[in-house]
């Protein structure tokens, strides 16, 4: 299933990426 494959591929790495993103956003807010 193409959609499931794509979601899996995006979601797999993006779990770690999500935490990185949050970390980056928090850092960005604090640096202002």
From Swiss-Prot:
The keyword Chloroplast does not apply. The N-terminus is blocked. It comes from the Eukaryota. GO terms for molecular function: serine-type peptidase activity; toxin activity. Inhibited by phenylmethanesulfonyl fluoride (PMSF). Not inhibited by EDTA, EGTA, beta-mercaptoethanol, indoacetamide, benzamidine, aprotinin, pepstatin A and trypsin inhibitor. One of its GO terms (biological process) is proteolysis. Optimum pH is 9.0. Activity is stable from pH 6 to 11 but decreases sharply below pH 6. Its EC number is 3.4.21.-. Signal peptide: none annotated. Optimum temperature is 60 degrees Celsius. Activity is stable from 40 to 80 degrees Celsius. Keywords: Fibrinogenolytic toxin, Fibrinolytic toxin, Hemostasis impairing toxin, Hydrolase, Protease, Serine protease, Toxin. Plasmin-like serine protease. Has fibrinolytic and fibrinogenolytic but not plasminogenolytic activity. Cleaves after Arg and Lys residues. This is Fibrinolytic enzyme. It comes from Hediste japonica (Polychaete worm).
